[in-house]
Design a protein with these regions (language model features):
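Short, compositionally biased P/S/T/A/G/V-rich stretches that sit at domain boundaries
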Residues: 20-53, 160-174, 289-302
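Short acidic/polar inter-strand loop motif in beta-rich domains
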Residues: 82-84, 128, 142-150, 210, ...
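Aromatic-rich carbohydrate-binding modules that target alpha-glucans
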Residues: 96-119, 211-218, 314-361, 373-402
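Ligand-binding face of N-terminal immunoglobulin V-set domains in extracellular IgSF glycoproteins
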Residues: 113-143
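Basic K/R-rich, polyanion-interacting modules in nucleoproteins and related proteins
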Residues: 273-323, 410-420
Length: 420
């Protein structure tokens, strides 16, 4: 009884704190020495970071810390609701044991000019099992300085008790085979599983894992026995964008895709990319991409995790100077957001926008987003163009909070690769 009362009181305290001030749970790297953060299922590095309860397909978490000396690090997880604010659950309710553990799997870089340690761990693992589905905020920090967070990232745990069928089309409610794509989806469930679909469910829709333009829905279009339909909703109409641009820096001694030259200037390799052109006025051109993802790879080594070097990567965009906003490089390597260190700056002598980033050898997808002043949502139209034929990744996550429940359960998700 005492344990129950303590749990309830802790939950009420956390709820009060969350209501008093919103917590910043956006993915972000807070220490510039942390690089190449990746979270993905072990079966496919290009799938979203969602673990299905009871599955053997665990999530792999990997990152580098740039230093000559090893740093002893820990991680923790915190349960969040559908809107990514912390839930009222206490750790003992959502994970086994403690909600934090040491990162014990790490290795020093080998034969690289940039010295780093590569860290790896999986979730769930022997130290930590998930009791509850939903969103989880992952935090990594120094063992002896837990208040200083190195980075935080998002992952999810899914029950997979419903089937989510996602469709995307260029025949939208605002135009036909023009500049937009419209998403619709159904949620199929067993009778009795969802008592009040109109009030229990929250659906979250994202395009290419971007966070700046994801959509939250709290009311379905239609409910029928065993099925919920989300359709003809203006919020589900997305600018179509364009196929992601691609570069490769997998080989330091030969030509790479999208790279003009690779040179060494102490202490770094430098990769000067070919100058990009704005594509808004150009016809659509198909290219098979990974929808913004990246992979670490050194073509000259069997141990890419520790034998891939870092290069100062020079992006440049041939574009007239634009006012009233900013241009950003965006991809999974920018945490899916237009980030400050990925802002392009106009170079008057060359007449181009430029940005320099320290990136590990690999294959990268990226695009240029225009963010108007006063907005946090990136636009593809001004630079990349919005082409209805574009193949986009649309992820739909469905959460359920029955009456009287204290947290949002992630009951299912679905992915569509299309839009035509």
């Amino acid at each position: 009884m005492k344990t129950f009362l303590f749990t309830v009181l802790c939950g009420m305290l956390l709820a009060g704190q969350a209501m008093a001030q919103a917590v910043n749970t956006l993915p972000q790297v807070l220490d510039s020495k942390v690089k190449s953060v990746q979270i993905a299922p072990s079966s496919n590095p290009y799938l979203p970071p969602i673990y299905v309860m009871g599955s053997d397909d665990v999530l792999n978490i990997t990152f580098d810390y740039l230093d000559y000396d090893v740093h002893y690090l820990r991680y923790s997880v915190r349960h969040c609701n559908a809107n990514w604010q912390p839930s009222v659950l206490v750790p003992s309710e959502y994970v086994s044991g403690f909600n934090e553990a040491d990162i014990t799997d790490y290795a020093q870089s080998n034969s690289t000019f940039v010295h780093y340690y590569n860290y790896n761990f999986t979730l769930p693992n022997a130290d930590m099992q998930f009791y509850k589905s939903g969103n989880y905020l992952l935090t990594v920090y120094e063992q002896d300085n837990p208040e200083t967070v190195l980075f935080q990232a998002r992952l999810a745990v899914c029950e997979n008790t419903v089937a989510v069928h996602v469709d995307a089309t260029s025949r939208t409610d605002v135009d036909y085979n023009d500049r937009h794509q419209q998403v619709s989806f159904t949620v199929d469930y067993k009778q009795g599983l969802i008592a009040d679909p109109y009030n229990e469910l929250t659906a979250v829709v994202s395009q290419n894992s971007r966070l700046d333009n994801e959509v939250y829905l709290t009311r379905p279009f239609m409910v029928s026995p065993g099925q919920v339909t989300y359709d003809h909703n203006r919020s589900l109409i997305f600018p179509a964008g364009n196929e992601y641009r691609r570069i490769e820096t997998v080989n330091l001694h030969s030509l790479n895709m999208g790279v003009e030259r690779v040179q060494y200037f102490e202490p770094y390799y430098h990769a000067t990319l070919r100058v990009d052109e704005a594509r808004a006025a150009s016809p659509y051109l198909y290219d098979k991409t990974q929808h913004g993802h990246f992979t670490i790879r050194n073509a000259e080594s069997d141990y890419s995790a520790t034998e891939s070097d870092y290069l100062v990567t020079h992006f440049s965009l041939d574009c007239d100077r634009m006012t009233g906003g900013k241009i950003y490089v965006q991809g999974a390597f920018t945490q899916g957001l237009p980030a400050a260190d990925c802002e392009m700056h106009y170079d008057q002598p060359s007449g181009t926008y430029t940005c320099d980033m320290l990136l590990k050898q690999g294959a990268y997808n990226y695009q240029y987003l225009w963010v108007p002043n006063g907005s946090s949502v990136g636009q593809t139209g001004p630079i990349e163009g919005d082409k209805y034929q574009t193949t986009n990744e649309y992820l739909v996550k469905v959460y359920d909070r029955p009456s009287g429940e204290r947290y949002d359960r992630l009951i299912g998700y679905g992915i569509n690769y299309g839009g035509k």
